[in-house]
Curated annotation (Swiss-Prot):
Molecular-function GO terms, alphabetical: sucrose:proton symporter activity
Protein name (database record): Sucrose transport protein SUT2
Record's subunit section: Homodimer.
Function: Responsible for the transport of sucrose into the cell, with the concomitant uptake of protons (symport system). May also transport other glucosides.
Source taxon at top rank: Eukaryota
Recorded topology in the membrane: Multi-pass membrane protein
InterPro entries, alphabetized: MFS, MFS_trans_sf, Suc_symporter_pln
Record topology, Extracellular segments: 53-55, 120-135, 198-222, 300-327, 378-394, 455-467
CDD domains xrefs: MFS_SLC45_SUC
Species whose genome carries this gene: Oryza sativa subsp. japonica
Keyword Transmembrane helix: yes
A single GO BP: sucrose metabolic process
Length: 501
């Protein structure tokens, strides 16, 4: 695989480069689709693990449902990135990235409708509406929608990241700013999504969502997904109309899409042999970081409902306590997103001052401390005397919310720095930005597969609950932090304004 010239090449002279320098305000609009995508993702993270347990899947197997996310991401995001790299910019009136962004958004809209109405569709397929019964039809419909939702998420976010990388022309500073904009919109989508999930009165605003097969909690979820579609359509239109895609790139891939194309998987995995040590370090730290994040993503609100509020989604006598905990967890995730947004604003200054590697490493160690704090809170709550149907002590709830909030800072860094570092370091390998984002995605989804497969056995091995997964998360985050501090550059990537390695 040939290296491309460090100047960007492709016959584009200085004038073309000047034309391609997109104003920051247009980069801001180009990143806005992250708000719509993340709104639905926030609902997925906060509400769907509890909801699938309501449908009848046991807690020990709930993590297996999330396998569809990393498995679809394992192929969908690299494939979409590869295909968008190969499209000649002039071949489509929307360029080469925006058609995939629009198609992914349409998939998300179809998916959330399927998930939201899964209980009603399950009733059509013969499900019982008796409380506590397993609804096989609804589970099947839910799984189809869940898979489609993850495919849509991967098909949208990958091309959007590559779109931003194209617009910034691999300038490290502008790339970090563009990814910070993306993180800022993700934070806004998170805030809106988690606030929507924390509100329990949507069924009153949309009374048609309550049906014999869809209880109040189900109707609230259904209403939230209807709001998601509105926000997704608006933000997708803003992104697609924001800026014209560059007509010239640093590689001749797009100019000759029908020649010299290697088989996709061979190109994806074969590119590994060209990676330098710094690229491998970025991928290793990314993998360890996501081994840390995924247990929290899977079980954050479930942890609040089970361990803190002592409820259960499959025991009618304490179901209300569980839902109260889930809503409180959604509120905590909303606070998390506020800090995420603030961190996204100041992240560029932090990287300039301390270096991207050090900032990333310190954030991972902070993650580890937060997960250890969750284990301590779990232990303290378990040994306190309050009834399952009662309200947990205020101190325990506040401590849990503080941990949820603090985790917003490292989450903002996870959403930004790995992508910026990958974009600036992989460019000279002869890869398009779409495939580069797909390769980074492998370092995200493979750890998610490991956690999804391991969470159930860890749960059963240690007597149930979410503590074992959080212990693994703490260890992986701490190791990832040390590797980032010792193995990634501190100042070099932050001090360079232009050019390539």
């Amino acid at each position: 695989m040939p290296r491309r010239p460090s100047g960007g090449g492709g016959g584009a002279g200085p004038a073309a480069a000047a034309v391609r320098k997109v104003p920051l305000r247009k980069l801001l609009r180009a990143a806005s689709v992250a708000c719509g995508v993340q709104f639905g993702w926030a609902l997925q993270l906060s509400l769907l693990t509890p909801y699938v347990q309501e449908l009848g899947i046991p807690h020990a197997f709930a993590s297996l449902v999330w396998l569809c996310g990393p498995l679809s991401g394992l192929l969908v995001q690299p494939l979409v990135g590869h295909l968008s790299d190969r499209i000649a910019p002039a071949a489509s009136p929307l360029g080469r990235r925006r058609p995939f962004i629009a198609a992914g958004a349409a998939s998300i809209a179809a998916a959330v409708l399927t998930v939201g109405f899964s209980a009603d569709l399950g009733r059509i397929f013969g499900d019982s509406i008796t409380p506590g019964s397993t609804r096989l039809g609804a589970i099947i419909v839910y799984l189809v929608g869940f898979w489609l939702l993850d495919v849509g998420n991967n098909a949208t976010q990958g091309p959007c990241r590559a779109f931003l990388a194209d617009l910034t022309e691999n300038d490290p500073r502008r790339t970090r700013i563009a990814n910070a904009y993306f993180s800022l919109f993700m934070a806004l989508g998170n805030i809106l999504g988690y606030a929507t999930g924390a509100y329990s009165g949507w069924y009153k605003i949309f009374p048609f969502t309550v049906t014999p097969s869809c209880s109040i909690s189900c109707a609230n979820l259904k209403s939230a997904f209807l709001l998601d579609i509105i926000i997704l359509v608006v933000t997708t239109c803003i992104t697609v109309a924001s800026v014209q895609e560059p007509q010239s790139f640093g590689s001749d891939e797009a100019d000759h899409p029908s020649t010299e194309q290697e088989a996709f998987l061979w190109e994806l995995f074969g590119s590994f042999r060209y990676f330098t040590l710094p690229v491998w370090m970025v991928l290793i730290v990314t993998a360890l970081t996501w081994i840390g994040w995924f247990p929290f993503i899977l079980f954050d609100t479930d942890w609040m409902g089970r361990e803190i509020y002592r409820g259960s989604p499959d025991d009618p006598s304490i179901t209300q306590s569980y839902h109260d905990g889930v809503r409180m967890g959604s509120f905590g995730l909303m606070l998390n997103s506020v800090l995420l947004g603030f961190t996204s604003i100041v992240l560029e200054k932090l990287c300039r001052k301390w270096g991207a590697g050090l900032v990333w490493g310190v954030s991972n160690i902070l993650m580890a401390l937060c997960f250890v704090a969750m284990l301590v809170i779990t232990y303290v709550a378990k040994n306190m005397d309050y009834p399952p149907s009662g309200v947990p002590p205020t101190g325990i709830v506040i401590a849990s919310l503080v941990v949820f909030t603090i985790l917003g800072a490292p989450l903002a860094i996870t959403y930004s720095i790995p992508y910026a570092m990958a974009a600036s370091r992989v460019e000279n390998l002869g890869l398009g930005q779409g495939l580069a984002m797909g390769i980074l995605n492998l370092a995200i989804v493979i750890p998610q597969v490991i956690v999804s497969l391991g969470s159930g056995p860890w749960d059963q091995l240690f007597g149930g609950g979410n503590a074992p997964a959080f212990a693994v998360a703490a260890a992986a985050s701490f190791i990832g932090g040390l590797v980032a501090i010792l193995g990634l550059p501190r100042a070099r990537i932050a001090s360079r304004r232009r050019g390539h390695r």
